[in-house]
A protein has these predicted regions:
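Boundary-flanking segments of nucleic-acid-binding domains in nuclear regulatory proteins
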Residues: 1-96
């Protein structure tokens, strides 16, 4: 099989920096908003999910597709979810 999965998770992009590989979580609202940059794709995927939750609570009505991380137990997911940071732009976002 010649299939290589480049982006396993919605809203996660790989960044090759001088300091190494990092993962950016980005969500599209009225343009792209960077949620944050993380050490792992799983952290970035969970940050994307957290941003979705925040935006829905703020009244944004979009059909965002959340990420499902099969490799984590619910408690491990919850631990990362509670610790992962989300950019101030998402926290302060006001729907139009």
């Amino acid at each position: 099989e010649n299939i290589e999965i480049l982006n396993r998770y919605h809203g996660v992009r790989v960044r090759n920096l001088k300091t190494g590989i990092r993962y950016a979580a980005i969500i599209h609202l009225n343009g792209n908003f960077t949620i944050g940059t993380y050490e792992s794709d799983i952290e970035a995927a969970i940050a994307y999910n957290k941003a979705i939750d925040i935006l829905i609570k703020k009244g944004v009505s979009r059909n965002f597709t959340p990420n499902y991380i099969e490799s984590l137990s619910p408690s491990a997911y919850a631990d990362i979810y509670s610790e992962v940071s989300v950019s101030r732009k998402i926290l302060d976002y006001r729907p139009i």
